[in-house]
C-alpha cells in the first residue's frame, strides 16, 4: 500500500520501495498505483552506473589506446631517465594491446605476444615502469616475487598463485584478468647455479622456471575460487593466460662480467691489442645483453625464448637522482612538503643538500630506493617534534643535515606585538 490515513484523517503517501512517507523525503514521484522517492531514484542511478562501468571494463583495456609516443610521454611524468627502456616498453605494450583489439577479426596472420624482460640495478625504476604502464592503460596489475615461488607440491607459493592475485585485484572478473599485466620481480634469483642442466631437484630455482614456461606462453590456469586452498572435489576458476602480458625484472648481478668475457676477447703476442676491462661501466656493458648471456647466467633457454623483448636500465647517476627528488608528479620532496604542510610548515631543501642526498644514495648502491630512507632519517626528529610546536613556518635542510647528521634549521613565525603592553 502506498497510501495510508494519518490519525488526523489526512491521506499520507509512502514510497513503494523504502516505505518512507512524503514528509520524510524531498520528493515523491507518482506512477500507476505506486510512488518512488528521490532517495530510491538516486540509489537506482548508482546501481545502473556501477553495472554500466563494469560492463565497459569487461571489454578489456581502454579503447582509445595511447600511441607509443604518448605512452613514453606519460612514463616521463613519473620515471626519470631510462629513455631507451621506455621506448622498448612503450612499443611492446602498444603492440600487445593492439593485438588484443584485433583478436576477434579473421586473418591468416596470427599475432603472437611478446613478453618483456627488464634488466637493471636495484632502484633503477623497473617496478615503477610496469606500475605506471598498468595505471595508464587501466588494466589489472599484480607484482609477484619470484623468490617465494616453488614447484607444485612443495612448501611455498605455486606459480598459479600469481594469477590468483591478479584475479583478486579485479574482483574476480575473469575477462578483465585475462587482459592484465603481471610483473614478476627478482626473476634473476631463481636462476640455476650453472648453465648446465642440474641432476638434482632444484624446487625454487630451475623448477620454478620450468613451471613458469606454460604460464608465460599461455595456458589454462586453475585458480581456487575466492582465494581458497586447492583440494580435491573443488570447483576451480579457469583463466586463460594467453593474453596476459608478463614483464619480468631483475638486477642480474654478475651479468656484466659474463658479457665482458664474451665480448672483450684478448689476444696473445706482441702485436695483440690489450683491452682494459675498466673501460666501460657495468651499465654500459649490460646494454650488450644477448640471450646466450642470460642462459649462462642461469635462466633456462626455454624461458629466455619466451621473453623476446629485453630492455636494459642504466644505473642512475647524481643528476638523475636529483631530478627524481624534484621533478616527477609524486616526487619525494613534494611528498614530504605535503606532510609538513599538514602541520603548517614549509619544507626547503638547499641545492647542496640535494647533491649530498644523491651522493649518499649512490654510495649505498640502492638507487632511487635509498633516497626515501635518507630523507626519512634527516626529517625524523622534525616530524616527531613538529606536531607539538605551534609557531614553525619553515624547515630548512642543508648539507650538514645530510652529511653530519645536524638538526634541520627551524624558522618561526614572528610573534605579533600586543598594543598597549608594558
Curated annotation (Swiss-Prot):
GO-annotated biological processes = cell division; proteolysis involved in protein catabolic process
N-terminal signal peptide: none
| PROSITE patterns reported for this sequence | CLPX_ZB
Residues binding Zn(2+) are 15, 18, 37, 40
Name the SUPFAM superfamilies for this protein.
Answer: Glucocorticoid receptor-like (DNA-binding domain), P-loop containing nucleoside triphosphate hydrolases
The text of the family note is: Belongs to the ClpX chaperone family.
> What name does the UniProt record give this protein?
ATP-dependent Clp protease ATP-binding subunit ClpX
Amino acid at each position: 500500500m502506498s497510501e495510508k490515513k494519518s490519525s488526523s484523517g489526512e491521506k499520507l503517501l509512502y514510497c513503494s520501495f523504502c516505505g518512507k512517507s512524503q514528509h520524510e523525503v524531498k520528493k515523491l514521484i507518482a506512477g500507476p498505483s505506486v510512488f518512488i522517492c528521490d532517495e530510491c531514484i538516486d540509489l537506482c542511478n548508482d546501481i545502473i552506473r556501477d553495472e554500466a562501468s563494469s560492463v565497459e571494463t569487461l571489454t578489456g583495456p581502454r579503447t582509445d589506446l595511447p600511441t607509443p609516443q604518448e605512452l613514453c610521454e606519460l612514463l616521463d611524468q613519473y620515471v626519470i631517465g631510462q629513455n631507451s627502456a621506455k621506448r622498448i616498453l612503450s612499443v611492446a605494450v602498444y603492440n600487445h594491446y593492439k593485438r588484443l583489439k584485433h583478436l576477434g577479426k579473421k586473418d591468416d596472420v596470427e599475432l603472437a605476444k611478446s613478453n618483456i624482460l627488464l634488466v637493471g640495478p636495484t632502484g633503477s625504476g623497473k617496478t615503477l615502469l610496469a606500475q605506471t604502464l598498468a595505471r595508464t592503460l587501466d588494466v589489472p596489475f599484480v607484482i609477484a616475487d619470484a623468490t617465494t615461488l616453488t614447484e607444485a607440491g612443495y612448501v611455498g607459493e605455486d606459480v598459479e598463485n600469481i594469477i590468483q592475485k591478479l584475479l583478486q585485484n579485479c574482483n574476480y572478473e575473469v575477462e578483465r584478468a585475462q587482459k592484465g599485466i603481471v610483473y614478476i620481480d627478482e626473476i634473476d634469483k631463481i636462476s640455476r647455479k650453472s648453465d648446465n642442466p642440474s641432476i638434482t631437484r632444484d624446487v625454487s630455482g630451475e623448477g620454478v622456471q620450468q613451471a613458469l614456461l606454460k604460464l608465460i606462453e599461455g595456458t589454462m590456469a586453475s585458480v581456487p575460487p575466492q582465494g581458497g586452498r586447492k583440494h580435491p572435489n573443488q570447483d576451480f576458476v579457469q583463466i586463460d593466460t594467453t593474453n596476459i602480458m608478463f614483464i619480468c625484472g631483475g638486477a642480474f648481478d654478475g651479468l656484466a662480467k659474463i658479457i665482458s668475457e664474451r665480448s672483450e676477447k684478448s689476444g696473445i703476442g706482441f702485436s695483440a691489442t690489450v683491452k682494459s676491462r675498466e673501460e666501460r661501466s657495468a651499465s654500459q656493458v649490460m646494454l650488450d645483453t644477448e640471450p646466450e648471456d642470460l642462459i649462462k647466467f642461469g635462466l633456462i633457454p626455454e624461458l629466455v625464448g619466451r621473453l623476446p623483448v629485453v630492455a636494459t636500465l642504466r644505473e642512475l647517476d647524481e643528476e638523475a637522482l636529483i631530478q627524481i627528488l624534484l621533478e616527477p608528479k609524486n616526487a619525494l620532496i613534494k611528498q614530504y612538503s605535503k606532510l609538513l604542510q599538514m602541520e603548517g610548515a614549509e619544507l626547503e631543501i638547499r641545492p647542496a643538500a640535494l647533491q649530498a642526498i644523491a651522493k649518499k644514495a649512490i654510495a649505498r648502491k640502492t638507487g632511487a630506493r635509498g633516497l626515501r630512507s635518507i630523507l626519512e632519517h634527516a626529517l625524523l626528529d622534525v616530524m616527531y617534534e613538529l606536531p607539538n610546536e605551534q609557531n614553525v613556518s619553515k624547515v630548512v635542510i642543508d648539507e650538514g643535515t645530510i652529511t653530519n647528521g645536524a638538526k634541520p634549521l627551524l624558522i618561526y613565525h614572528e610573534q605579533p606585538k600586543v598594543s598597549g603592553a608594558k
